[in-house]
Design a protein with these regions (language model features):
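Extracytoplasmic/peripheral linker and loop segments enriched in polar/acidic and small residues
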Residues: 169, 323, 335, 414-427, ...
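Structural transition elements
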Residues: 344-379, 395-399
Length: 543
């Protein structure tokens, strides 16, 4: 989703217990403080957003529209500061002696906005719900490291043989343990992601109703009803106990289907914060907004994904076709002219903001080389028909999509066209259902700051965001090898070996690393965007 560096993800095996005691046992700080009395607290911040794809359940939200709302309404065991560093929130401590069994202690005094206490069972029940295959949760994959996942989420169409993971044990109201199938030192650092948020017991009584009106424990609470395709309003949560206390009265997230319109409203000061600038104004937004323009690196990548479940993209020669297409894309020119320097050509499948990023893993296959691209396509037997690229028109993608297929067409001499969908949800629905017929744009905003988060959720077999339906057992083995590693260097070596397989198979073509672009109105101050590319709404105040 979230998405989108991810975090200071690694704790080596030899220092795991000590580091966790120092980093995760202490109550962390942030730019906001729990005891602060917010100034200008009566003001509502007006934000541009997107319609969430699904009902608002943490374990079923894996896209930016819903992810933003989740981050406002819920708080996990940890959060991440503006640089991706882990900060304790609901967690009083997270400790381990072997990087396989972790003891989680929950702080006292936390409540959901309906008055229910946030306790150990709030997390354990939510994670078990998210993992159970019959619940069909998109984020189920994130619980795979936990012992017992295979029983609640078997491969294929098999029915689960258990309803809860035996690796999750509630000790008492404030303590639970998590036992992983294998040692994984980095596990705690992913616990700030949406999938790991707690749920109140009331959620399970009527999940459909809860998805429309979620009850969380975060900095904000829902204010009224979710008005679909119009707005979602949240107000400050008066019982919030964490460090991210809102310095404003709330956020009114207005749903836009056109970035040109949201930008026009920003210039008119009719909206306060915009995340994402339309490609149509990338050449002018810095001049228009001056110091209020945002253009900064973030853990977000843009790519072109192929539906490998369609016969034409699931042949031995189709790998070479995809490699040829990749070499036919003039990334340097597109990022410089169309994207106006707000993106950098990709050289791997991750992001420059994470440890393990590589400048050369993709090598020649991510470099513009018309001669080699033509030769490779010819060796693959050519391409028949029209190469279509699907995209959503509400995200400001038209110009770069057209520039991309024009580059491919001019280089390879094949017919290309764009297939426009009116909004993100319309594009994502057939992708999620596995019924998309053509290649399509994808963007990944990191969930937590680590190399494996650019790989496992997108390319592991059965992963919730494996839009290509990529399936390579050797790749999955390398992911597991990296997860079991006891040092950052060992893990990165395995993950990068997996990336090399991706270069060979090319289920997804890396395009560029996207900067966070955005802006804010003349009416607000203290506006910053985090390493995930998301505004830090709790700090924003009205002038």
């Amino acid at each position: 989703m979230r998405g989108t560096t991810r975090r200071a993800r690694w704790v080596s095996a030899t220092t795991t217990a000590a580091c966790l005691a120092l980093v995760l046992c202490a109550c962390g700080g942030n730019t906001s403080t729990g005891s602060a009395s917010p100034k200008a607290g009566g003001a509502i911040i007006l934000a541009a957003g997107m319609e969430p794809q699904n009902p608002l359940l943490p374990t079923n939200t894996n896209e930016a529209g819903g992810g933003l709302i989740m981050s406002l309404l819920f708080q996990g065991l940890i959060s991440y500061d503006s640089h991706g560093k882990s900060i304790n929130q609901v967690a009083a401590s997270i400790t381990t002696t072997d990087s396989q069994t972790f003891t989680m202690k929950v702080k006292a005094g936390w409540t959901f906005t309906n008055g229910e206490p946030v306790n150990a069972r709030s997390f354990v029940d939510a994670w078990n719900f998210g993992a159970l295959s019959t619940n069909n949760q998109l984020n189920a994959y994130f619980f795979e490291p936990i012992e017992g996942y295979a029983e609640v989420h078997p491969v294929g169409d098999a029915q689960p043989t258990a309803r809860t993971m035996n690796g999750l044990v509630v000790i008492n109201s404030s303590t639970f343990t998590v036992r992983l199938a294998t040692a994984q030192a980095s596990f705690p650092s992913r616990l700030g992601y949406t999938a790991f948020y707690p749920l109140p017991q009331s959620a399970y009584k009527n999940l459909k109703a809860f998805g429309e009106h979620p009850i969380g424990n975060g900095s904000y609470m829902l204010d009224g009803n979710w008005v679909h395709n119009v707005s979602i309003k949240v107000k400050r949560n008066p019982t919030y106990k964490g460090t991210l206390v809102a310095k404003n009265a709330g956020v009114d997230v207005k749903v836009y289907t056109d970035q040109i319109q949201s930008y026009a409203d920003l210039l008119a000061n009719d909206v306060d914060v915009v995340q994402g600038i339309s490609d149509g104004v990338l050449d002018s937004f810095k001049a228009d907004l001056g110091s209020r323009a945002i253009n900064q690196p973030s853990g977000t990548t843009d790519s072109l994904t192929f539906p490998l479940y369609q016969p034409e993209w699931n042949t031995a020669s189709s790998k070479q076709v995809r490699q040829a297409i990749s070499m036919a894309i003039d990334r340097q020119t597109i990022t410089k002219t169309v994207l106006q320097g707000t993106s950098t050509p990709a050289t791997d499948f991750s992001s420059p903001v994470v440890q393990g990023y590589s400048k050369d893993i993709c090598g020649e296959f991510c470099a513009f080389n018309p001669a080699k691209a033509k030769a490779l396509l010819a060796a693959a037997g050519g391409f028949k028909g029209t190469l279509e690229i699907a995209y959503n028109t509400d995200g400001g993608h038209k110009a770069w999509v057209e520039a991309t297929w024009n580059s491919i067409k001019a280089t390879l001499g094949i017919d290309c066209s764009a297939r426009a969908y009116p909004d993100r949800k319309s594009l994502r629905d057939p992708i999620t259902k596995g019924s998309m017929k053509v290649a399509f744009r994808t963007s990944w905003q990191m969930d937590y700051p680590a190399l494996e988060d650019f790989l496992a959720p997108i390319f592991a077999k059965g992963a919730g965001s494996n839009d290509a339906h990529y399936d390579n057992p050797s790749f999955d083995d390398l992911l597991q090898e990296g997860d079991k590693a006891t040092t950052p260097a060992e893990a990165i070596k395995s993950y990068q070996a997996g990336e090399k397989l991706l270069v060979t198979d090319m289920p997804v073509i890396p395009l560029w690393y996207a900067n966070t672009t955005g802006g804010y109105s003349e009416n607000v101050s203290n506006v910053k965007f985090d390493v995930f590319g998301v505004p830090i709404f709790t700090d924003i105040t009205r002038k």
